[in-house]
Amino acid sequence: MQNLIAILTLALLATHFTTACQTPTSTSTSRLPSWTLTPTNTTQQFRGLGPVSNDIVWVSGTKGTVLRTNDAGSTWTDVSPHFSLSENASNFEFRDIEAWSANSAVILSIGEGNLSRIYQTRDGGETWKMTFVNQEAAAFYDCMAFEKEIPSHGIARSDPVNGRFRLIETWDSGSHWSILSMNGTLPAALPGEFGFAASGTCIEAAAGRWYIATGGVDPGRIFRSTNPRLGWHLSNSSITGAAAAGVFSVRFRDAKDGIAVGGDFEKPTANKDIASWSCDGGVEWHKAVSFPGGYRSDVAWVPGRKDTAVAVGTSGSDITFDGGRNWTGFGNGTFDAVECINRGVCWASGARGRVAKLVMGDE
Ligand SMILES: *[C@@H]1O[C@H](CO)[C@@H](O)[C@H](O)[C@H]1NC(C)=O
Ligand SMILES: *[C@@H]1O[C@H](CO)[C@@H](O)[C@H](O)[C@H]1NC(C)=O
Ligand SMILES: *[C@@H]1O[C@H](CO)[C@@H](O)[C@H](O)[C@H]1NC(C)=O
Ligand SMILES: *[C@@H]1O[C@H](CO)[C@@H](O)[C@H](O)[C@H]1NC(C)=O
Ligand SMILES: *[C@@H]1O[C@H](CO)[C@@H](O)[C@H](O)[C@H]1NC(C)=O
Ligand SMILES: *[C@@H]1O[C@H](CO)[C@@H](O)[C@H](O)[C@H]1NC(C)=O
Ligand SMILES: *[C@@H]1O[C@H](CO)[C@@H](O)[C@H](O)[C@H]1NC(C)=O
């Protein structure tokens, strides 16, 4: 009887596995999209990208710069925080932004010691309040993520402190943050392992699950958790890691299907083993069949188009129509971050003030 149950269970598991991992049938291999640049009138680099709707988008980046558009990129308004005379805006680089409306957003600045900070606005960027300032010498904050289902719940992620990735958590949309301090349950890092503050997506929240991407070790690794207070599991990503290489971005469209991208930012066109996909919630990661054209710092699923995702990096952009198995290049302009919102609209941002939009035609 027990054997029978075991066999039945195995059969069920096998069926479930096969169903979950069915190869997507790519329907829309046809037209490739193209980016349209918008006039930001600045040369700052924007690694922080926060689209809210088709019209409202925020970007954040170097020299303490934050811009917002309310008209789909036709015009951009400088809504940067004002720094006191003793604090030079040039020292601040906002590598990540999360925005909920034209009024409400939080930004993360990177750096050693107290340069790692989080600011919050409720009035469209007219005023910003510092709601977190790092006091740990070893910490260096890289990225943050908020849940779609519980938008007030977010986690910001730092490089390791005492051998474990440092995480801070907010339950009120970034007004207050506290360190998740249970040593035994935080993700343990290998020597030399860290995260990339390249696009704000080295931590991901999707369908009630959390993911953390790492590099500096080979291969780059991906941690996952259904409850960050209780513990983390980890997997090899199948993406090659090195001093400047590993997993830069991990994104899930639901509880099962995820894509990870990365590579070596010092070798922008090297593309061996720089992208992988998972269909079991990040337990196993499989190498892509054909890779994007080079190092990619960010990837975003396109909502409403089941197996479509867009990846960007300093050497260009790529699209997949089969959930990350095969990638096709479209455009070679430099970008750091990409986000897609409803109705096949994506935004990308990067160096030299580049912020661009693409609208995919009907499927
Ligand atoms: C662009 O920026 C320059 C220098 O900051 C400024 O003088 C000019 O008015 C801006 N142009 C637009 C269209 O915003
Ligand atoms: C701010 O820093 C920049 C770059 O380090 C420097 O060029 C500038 O003079 C500084 N400004 C002030 C007011 O200290
Ligand atoms: C950051 O550190 C500098 C140098 O130690 C100090 O002068 C400044 O007051 C600190 N700022 C904050 C917000 O902690
Ligand atoms: C976590 O570990 C560090 C170093 O091992 C130790 O100093 C610290 O007290 C620990 N914190 C907690 C909350 O256990
Ligand atoms: C992950 O990769 C490391 C380094 O190659 C290897 O030692 C380890 O066994 C791998 N873990 C799994 C679960 O495959
Ligand atoms: C895409 O990847 C699949 C494996 O999932 C492979 O069988 C297929 O031939 C590839 N398609 C193209 C167009 O390269
Ligand atoms: C990028 O694309 C443009 C337009 O297709 C082309 O003229 C240019 O040579 C390309 N640059 C590189 C570095 O491939």
Short names for language-model regions:
Residues 3-18:
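Cleavable N-terminal signal peptides of Sec/SRP-targeted secreted and luminal proteins
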Residues 21-363:
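Residue-level hotspots at or immediately adjacent to binding/recognition sites across diverse folds
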